């Protein structure tokens, strides 16, 4: 997969993107035939225990992007630019985005609308592919006053449309639409020539993205309406750990089968 192939999928084949934060997850995503792996700054609240994405640092993101690359070296990987890694200056943004490509990302994702058009253009001119992200942008949640659906007012609808067109004009190869009302997401999708990838933005985007922990049911305390739980791995893992604990406590594990003697043959693997 590459930028040009993704762009050609618009209107022909739905794009599938998932988040992944480590090598084993990336390998599974690759083996499942996922088109794009996003190393999201959602790392913060899904893996690092932060309340939201705002505390996530460049250093943390770089570690996880590199891990994902090792797990799926041939995958198309997009790295989220974390809070304040690109907002302070164009020069700083180019420097930070370049770091992601050096550790294995194929592109970066930037939250924000038309006000970041010049920055997107500079990144693209520097050889860094950019995926835009408009609608609900979690890094700006304090400005929105919470996690609210976007596109409900005419003013906001017009802003989102302008932003999508500006990002396209400046060279973005795709745009994530997050929590945008379905009608507006459809209008945006039809108004630009680059793919839109929706999350909580209805049926008419060119692709869909979900967070790893949401679609696999790894967080029992969070069930967003826009997501779908395709598995309940929290319960699967919980039961496995409970069974392990029980067998150790009762002396049922390890058995002779799991032990070595001076007559054992072969190596560690079975």
Swiss-Prot record:
Residues annotated as the enzyme's active site: 178
Keywords: Cytoplasm, Magnesium, Metal-binding, Pantothenate biosynthesis, Transferase
Reaction(s) this enzyme catalyzes, per UniProt: 3-methyl-2-oxobutanoate + (6R)-5,10-methylene-5,6,7,8-tetrahydrofolate + H2O = 2-dehydropantoate + (6S)-5,6,7,8-tetrahydrofolate
Keyword Nuclease: no
Record-listed Mg(2+) binding positions: 41, 80, 111
GO biological process: pantothenate biosynthetic process
CDD domains on file: KPHMT-like (cd06557)
Subcellular location: Cytoplasm
Gene Ontology MF term list: 3-methyl-2-oxobutanoate hydroxymethyltransferase activity; magnesium ion binding
Biological pathway: Cofactor biosynthesis; (R)-pantothenate biosynthesis; (R)-pantoate from 3-methyl-2-oxobutanoate: step 1/2
GO cellular component: cytoplasm
Cofactor note: Binds 1 Mg(2+) ion per subunit.
Chief subcellular location: cytoplasm
Superkingdom classification of source: Bacteria
Cofactor needs: Mg(2+)
PANTHER family: 3-METHYL-2-OXOBUTANOATE HYDROXYMETHYLTRANSFERASE
Classification via HAMAP family: PanB
Similarity annotation: Belongs to the PanB family.
Biological role: Catalyzes the reversible reaction in which hydroxymethyl group from 5,10-methylenetetrahydrofolate is transferred onto alpha-ketoisovalerate to form ketopantoate.
Assembly and binders: Homodecamer; pentamer of dimers.
Name of the protein: 3-methyl-2-oxobutanoate hydroxymethyltransferase
């Amino acid at each position: 997969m590459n930028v040009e192939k993704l762009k050609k999928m618009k209107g022909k084949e739905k794009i599938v993107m998932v988040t992944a934060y480590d090598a084993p997850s990336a390998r599974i995503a690759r083996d499942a035939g996922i088109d794009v792996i996003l190393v999201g700054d959602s790392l913060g609240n899904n893996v690092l225990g932060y309340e939201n994405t705002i505390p996530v640092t460049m250093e943390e993101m770089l570690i996880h992007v590199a891990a994902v690359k090792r797990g799926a070296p041939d995958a198309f990987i997009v790295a989220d630019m974390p809070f304040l890694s690109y907002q302070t200056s164009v020069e700083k943004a180019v420097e930070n985005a370049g770091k992601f490509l050096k550790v294995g990302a194929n592109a970066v994702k930037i939250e924000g609308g038309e006000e970041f058009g010049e920055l997107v253009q500079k990144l693209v001119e520097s050889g860094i592919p950019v995926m835009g992200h408009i609608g609900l942008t979690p890094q700006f949640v304090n400005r929105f006053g919470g996690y609210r659906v976007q596109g409900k007012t005419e003013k906001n609808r017009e802003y989102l449309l302008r932003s999508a067109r500006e990002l396209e004009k400046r060279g973005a190869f795709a745009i994530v639409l997050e929590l945008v009302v379905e009608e507006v997401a459809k209008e945006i999708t039809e108004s630009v020539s680059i793919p839109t990838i929706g999350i909580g933005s209805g049926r008419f985007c060119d692709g869909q993205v979900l967070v790893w922990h949401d679609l696999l049911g790894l967080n029992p305390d969070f069930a967003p309406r826009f997501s779908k739980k395709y598995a309940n791995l929290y319960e699967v893992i919980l039961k496995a750990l409970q069974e392990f604990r029980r067998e150790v406590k009762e002396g049922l594990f390890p058995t002779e089968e799991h032990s070595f003697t001076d007559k054992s043959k072969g190596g560690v693997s079975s």
